[in-house]
Amino acid sequence: CIAAHTMGTNGNSVQVQYWTGSAWADLCPVTAVTSDEPIMVIFEPETRQRWRISITGGTAPEVGVIKFGTAMQMERPIYGGVAPIPMARQTILRSNYSETGEYLGRVQQRSYLSASYSWQHLTSDWVRANWPDFQRATEAEPFWLAWRPGTFGDVGYCQVDEVPIPSNMGIRDLLSVSMSVRARGYD
């Protein structure tokens, strides 16, 4: 996963590679980066000690965050009610007016992305096996979130203001969990 970068602006291409012990092997094809949105490369698990990101073309980019790790796939998908993170823009504006009420202008104080996710009917076994590690990780640092990565390329480099806590649904051993995330804007 890569975030806080300028590879789209700089016209770069990216490729993920790992060391086999004698040479670098390609994990994915060279891919042109078309925006400065966060990037998530999903692949079959590999146990390797050395990884690298090969960046080619364009001018030298700035890259703020790179992480390798195991992606947690939710037990059940979310089908509706989700605002695509790139379109969930929240902008705080400050307008200025004259003494007589005439509009003088506006400044943008900050902009970020904000979305909410809610999963239902998660089995107790799955939640107990997978959620505690994720929950602790959200307390410590931002994380990447991809909604339906096989269909859409929407990826957010997110953080939570409140730790997401699963709750019993009252149906057999099923739980639900919701979280509101704030993501870094990239423009």
Walk through the language-model features, giving the residues of each.
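Extracellular/virion structural assembly segments
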Residues: 1-11, 22-187
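Beta-strand signatures of extracellular beta-sandwich domains
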Residues: 13-17
